[in-house]
Amino acid sequence: MNEEEIKKCEIRINDKLIPFTYLYKFTNKGKYIIKYSFYNHLSKTNYMFSGCSSLTNINLSNFNTQNVTNMSDMFFGCSSLTNLDLSSFNTPKVTNLNGMFYGCSSLKSLDLSNFNTQNVTNMEHMFYECSSLKKENIITNDWILKNQF
């Protein structure tokens, strides 16, 4: 994310404005209400939730990803996350999905049904160390899963 993008985004957790870094480390258990305002300028979400080991559930249904090109390691190490619905993600510009869910060992179901992967050049290790996730529990739009595990 460049400086211009940072100026156009705002993140609030439990209505408290927080600075944008790699977002926020959800290491403490509890319920968080997260509100994003990125004004459609977000181009990278890589490492956004990386290391959020206590994150169990997140609703990203209104998260605008139309200009995102890099989603690598976005949920890296989110070991408590169990289900994730990313069917609202708009991904035609994404080129990098490397390690997106790496280490999400509790993840059991994943909806990627609207993922457009036509421009993706790197999907390596996308589901690496997702020991609870089975291929049949990943909803995709007919793209083939091979080197992602």
State where each predicted segment sits.
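Negatively charged
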Residues: 1-149
